Amino acid sequence: MARKDTNKQYSLRKLKTGTASVAVAVAVLGAGFANQTTVKANSKNPVPVKKEAKLSEAELHDKIKNLEEEKAELFEKLDKVEEEHKKVEEEHKKDHEKLEKKSEDVERHYLRQLDQEYKEQQERQKNLEELERQSQREVEKRYQEQLQKQQQLEKEKQISEASRKSLRRDLEASRAAKKDLEAEHQKLKEEKQISEASRKSLRRDLEASRAAKKDLEAEHQKLKEEKQISEASRQGLSRDLEASRAAKKDLEAEHQKLKEEKQISEASRQGLSRDLEASREAKKKVEADLAEANSKLQALEKLNKELEEGKKLSEKEKAELQAKLEAEAKALKEQLAKQAEELAKLKGNQTPNAKVAPQANRSRSAMTQQKRTLPSTGETANPFFTAAAATVMVSAGMLALKRKEEN
């Protein structure tokens, strides 16, 4: 209700203001016409008066026109106010309908709130009017202040221009320093990349060196073990060679005895049948010994060749072993040549000699009793082939083959 009364009062005030403006305009027009009439009556020179009247009439027409425009604007405002008033009434009606649905306490509270808002609105209106008056005073004051500020700004502008030039010089110097720093940074970055690549390369080289060191240590240990095996094999072979030489000497002595017995059997020519059998058996044994000696010789030559290809023996050891093997091979060749000659003689001198047969049997039994044993294995010595010699040769051959594969 309070809002509705307020809107009505506002509309009436606007209407009164518009009516008063029209009244003022009419009064001005009446005064203008009255002045025009007075001027015409009192003037002795009608022409100037007419000009003045025309000028006044034009001014009046302009004023009337302006007043009519203001009047039209006022009516438009009045229409707008009425429309707003209608809207407010509709809103108020809606609010009223809503309020009717609520309790009386809420309605009283709402009305009190509306009244409070109206009072606050009135207070704000007063404050606004006071603020307008203050604003006028402040406008004048600010104008003066603005003039002072303008002068101050001119001074500050000059100072700012000088400062701007100085800042520009500083900025250019800073940009140049920045470029130098960027170049230095890029250089340091490149040096860091080079250092990082070098560090990675050194690390790879170090790891490769460590791996190579481990491989060399393993190879060294392996070669050390192989050297020990080779040394043991060489010592065993040396002992077997010494035993073989001793057996060879015994065989030569026995062979000499057989030769003497053969001469005796050739002179006696008794026991042809038994001597012939003994001769054949001796022939078979000599042929078997010859074949065995050839096999031993080939094995020794092969071992000699493999030992020559070995890289882990010293030159002195190789020379000593080579000399021993060559001497042994030469002795075996001479022995084979002698046995071949004796075999040829046995083939050409097969004459009956019965009395000498027991002597031949005794000499063969003596040969059996005089066989020696090898010091390395304890086996019965054979001047041409032993199990220990075969083992040594096989071990040496395997060692040489393994070295070839590794190389």
Swiss-Prot record:
Belongs to the M protein family. Residues 81-94 are annotated as: 2 X 7 AA tandem repeats. Its main location: secreted. A motif (LPXTG sorting signal) lies at residues 374-378. This is M protein, serotype 2.1. Residues 83-144, 152-229, 237-264, 272-288 have a biased composition (Basic and acidic residues). Disulfide bonds: none annotated. Residues 378-407 form a propeptide. It comes from the Bacteria. It is a peptidoglycan-anchor. It is found in: Secreted, Cell wall. The keyword Coiled coil applies. C repeats lie at residues 151-185, 186-220, 221-255, 256-290. This protein is one of the different antigenic serotypes of protein M. Protein M is closely associated with virulence of the bacterium and can render the organism resistant to phagocytosis. GO terms for biological process: phagocytosis.
